């Protein structure tokens, strides 16, 4: 199993690479790529960790050597948020980066499962889909927007609020991956209940958690370490499913049946070919249903922005 990390010299990429070097199954290959010249050195640094995961690093304009034979590609390349920016301010720079890298994936490893971490995910996933479609290699079961950070944040915040162990809590988060499009299904957590005010406040905290980190880092970065952990969790789940493990479920932002929007984050049963089944989001509370209805315009506009970037 070969996993490639694109953007591997950045804050998320290095954290993700460290976790994958430690946790990928024995015999896996890990391939690191970034435009930054430090990247082969990051791979050498990680190669000293005693795990049976082979690692190589590549830098420069051409990602091809890193992508050859990849089964899973995780893209974290791009610029990070600074205070006062929202995820859509990133669009102008990151759209071009994602387009370029996905064009290289389409040529070199078109059958790979691709996880997009680069923000704004609501839009960059649509860009990736359109690029793959133009190249004639798009498979909607193999393209994912990685929204796992919203889930691990939800698990942490719910556990704190309700005095549970974070490992005992698993929150489904649906919709998209920014602001109001992030919708944790708090009403579906077994053995936990919330007042309406608690649900509203907690939902807002989860939606704004990225900004909490950006402000706390005072201009020195955004959520890199927790995002690295979230991306590793998603990537490792995908690898386990591709290797034939049954019953692997993760939420991610994928093209579905278009019931809510063309792309939508929902629970997915993963399998040997990527998405095996898009699972139901279940029964929503009145607050959740209202929040879902209210976000769809925003989500659809985000998606349209990505489609137009490639097709206009």
UniProtKB/Swiss-Prot annotation:
Its EC number is 1.1.1.37. One of its GO terms (biological process) is malate metabolic process. InterPro entries: L-lactate/malate_DH (IPR001557), Lactate/malate_DH_C (IPR022383), Lactate/malate_DH_N (IPR001236), Lactate_DH/Glyco_Ohase_4_C (IPR015955), Malate_DH_AS (IPR001252), Malate_DH_type1 (IPR010097), Malate_DH_type1_bac (IPR023958), NAD(P)-bd_dom_sf (IPR036291). NAD(+) binds at residues 7-13, 34, 94, 117-119, 227. Homodimer. Belongs to the LDH/MDH superfamily. MDH type 1 family. This is Malate dehydrogenase. It comes from Salmonella choleraesuis (strain SC-B67).
